[in-house]
Amino acid sequence: QGQVVDLSDWYTTMKDNDDFMNYPGRRSIIEAQADLVQAYWESNLDSYDRQRMASERPNFRCSVSLPEYFYIPLDLYYDFGGKLGKQIHSKGKMEALNEALYKLPTAEQIYSPEKYFSEEPYIYVDIETLELENFTVIDEGKIDSLDLVYLLQTKIGKNEAVNAAIGLGGGSWVDYINDSNDLFMTVKILGDDVNELNEISDAFQNWAD
């Protein structure tokens, strides 16, 4: 992967720019490609090496119960990302996966691979900064489908949250704070179409109930 794309400072660049929109795409494709390479390598082992590898593989067990939201990005990178990676590989082999390291699928395209192959774009949404008495702006940014799942899943469930996130066209947010450290957020979201926007709205209504 490092021979295809310069990975030496990709995370540092995102951190310096405070823009992690490309992280889900790169992480998912990197992990999917690594899994495929490992599977190919293991498929060429003889029976002796297979048995030896199985006997030397540690049996890790985690006795710690983590909050549900901890697993949300891992589901995207390893589960949904793995499925997208396999579909890309089946259509264009490793060359197509290498190309995906440049194209970098959006979080929505990872959740819904057909949107990757149709090259459905993420739409940048302008949001107005409000003049709020006693409040000042502290941060702003863009919303992707992973953000929606983060917000919604623990309340309304994985399937409904992901279905809503698949319909996201784009979005932006602005955070405000006052002297009492009260936070206020404004969000502007665009759906892929009216029906998708209504589905996102319904998901937020269920989340708020």
What are these regions (language model features)?
Residues 44-50, 95, 195-197, 208:
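Substrate-binding/catalytic groove segments of enzymes
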